[in-house]
């Protein structure tokens, strides 16, 4: 069984990848998508979104990182995939699942699920362009507005050369609205000969158990569930192995919050760092009552010094506040 950290544009950047993979329970992670239009990108474009390439394509914790590309031009994607490999990418992942309207309007992401022939052509050209030892993988949704074409799309990707598929079990139109249709993951597995990862609505160990039962998928990709519960991978791995596991407490999480904030201040401008901190903290409120208290304190705060104080001394007494 493999447990992967999902690529989430605007959320799971190199800072959050670093922090989440320190926790453990993640076998590999993926960059935010690198947008490919009509030209060969400069190396700096890859360095910006995938700085781990400078350290052997691994996070500081040693977790392998894969490079994800998004676009609709098979030849241009192939050229950029080859460059990514030259820069050290160990795997090329192709994005056919992004639901963002701005991305879809420019023929990127989930809108391409309307064109299974193009999906096949993209994967085929990328597969031809990169070294034989570099896997090419694909992430897809069930379709744009209906899952009716999901099996045709999955077949096109697999036959084009995808080493595995990650299936986000919702359509583009459904976005992130529950439920995830895990039964479609099972149907995809029935028609392709490559491994299939289940993705979508896995927030807890019980969700994982239900997903495995319905989808039949052994491998999973965790997105928002892991962001809101950083040790979810460890919890699932323990349940899989029949081991006892004590979930991460708020006290355990605080050092990670502070490390995230330290890196955010070092890598982002004072204008943007507070927003990134609040973005992650808001997602943590789903799993930690203490995060609700801290988020209420930080919600309207944009001063980095005051945020640092709240994450320091005051953060240490939050458990008492909610007890």
UniProtKB/Swiss-Prot annotation:
Any one Gene Ontology molecular-function term assigned to this protein's record: FMN binding
First-level EC class: oxidoreductase
Segment forming the signal sequence: none
Keyword Flavoprotein: yes
Co-factor requirement: FMN
EC number(s) per entry: 1.3.1.-
Keywords: Flavoprotein, FMN, NADP, Oxidoreductase, RNA-binding, tRNA processing, tRNA-binding
Residue numbers annotated as active site: 98 (proton donor)
Binding-site positions, FMN: 7-9, 68, 139, 199-201, 223-224
Keyword set includes Lipoprotein: no
InterPro entries found in the cross-reference section: Aldolase_TIM, DUS-like_FMN-bd, DUS_fam, DusC, DusC_C, tRNA_hU_synthase_CS
Stated role: Catalyzes the synthesis of 5,6-dihydrouridine (D), a modified base found in the D-loop of most tRNAs, via the reduction of the C5-C6 double bond in target uridines. Specifically modifies U16 in tRNAs.
Protein family per UniProt: Belongs to the Dus family. DusC subfamily.
Protein name per its UniProtKB record: tRNA-dihydrouridine(16) synthase
Organism: Pseudomonas putida (strain ATCC 47054 / DSM 6125 / CFBP 8728 / NCIMB 11950 / KT2440)
């Amino acid at each position: 069984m493999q447990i992967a950290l999902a690529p989430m544009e605007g959320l799971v950047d190199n800072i959050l990848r670093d922090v989440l993979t320190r926790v453990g329970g993640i076998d590999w992670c993926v960059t935010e998508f690198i947008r490919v239009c009509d030209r060969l990108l400069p190396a700096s474009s890859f360095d910006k979104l995938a700085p781990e390439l400078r350290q052997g394509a691994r996070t500081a914790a040693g977790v392998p990182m894969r490079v994800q590309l998004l676009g609709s031009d098979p030849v241009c994607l192939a050229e950029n995939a080859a460059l990514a490999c030259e820069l050290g990418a160990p795997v090329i992942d192709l994005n056919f699942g992004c639901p963002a309207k701005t991305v879809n309007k420019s023929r990127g992401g989930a809108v391409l699920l309307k064109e299974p022939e193009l999906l096949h052509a993209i994967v085929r050209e990328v597969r031809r362009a990169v070294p034989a030892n570099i896997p090419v993988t694909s992430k897809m949704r069930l379709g744009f507005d209906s899952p009716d074409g999901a099996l045709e799309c999955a077949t096109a990707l697999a036959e084009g050369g995808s080493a595995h598929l990650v299936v986000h079990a919702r359509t583009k139109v459904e976005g992130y609205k529950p439920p995830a249709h895990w039964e479609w993951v099972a149907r995809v597995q029935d028609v392709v000969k490559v491994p299939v990862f289940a993705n979508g609505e896995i927030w807890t160990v019980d969700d994982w158990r239900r997903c495995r039962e319905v989808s039949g998928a052994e491998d999973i990709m965790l997105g928002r569930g892991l962001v809101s519960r950083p040790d979810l991978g460890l919890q699932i791995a323990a349940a899989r192995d029949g081991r006892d596991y004590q979930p991460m407490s708020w006290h355990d999480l605080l050092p990670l919050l502070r490390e995230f904030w330290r890196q955010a201040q070092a890598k982002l401008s004072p204008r943007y760092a507070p927003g990134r901190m609040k973005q992650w903290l808001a997602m943590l409120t789903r799993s930690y009552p203490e995060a609700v208290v801290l988020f209420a304190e930080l919600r309207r705060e944009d001063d980095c010094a005051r945020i640092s104080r709240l994450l320091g001394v005051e953060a240490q007494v939050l458990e008492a506040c909610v007890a």
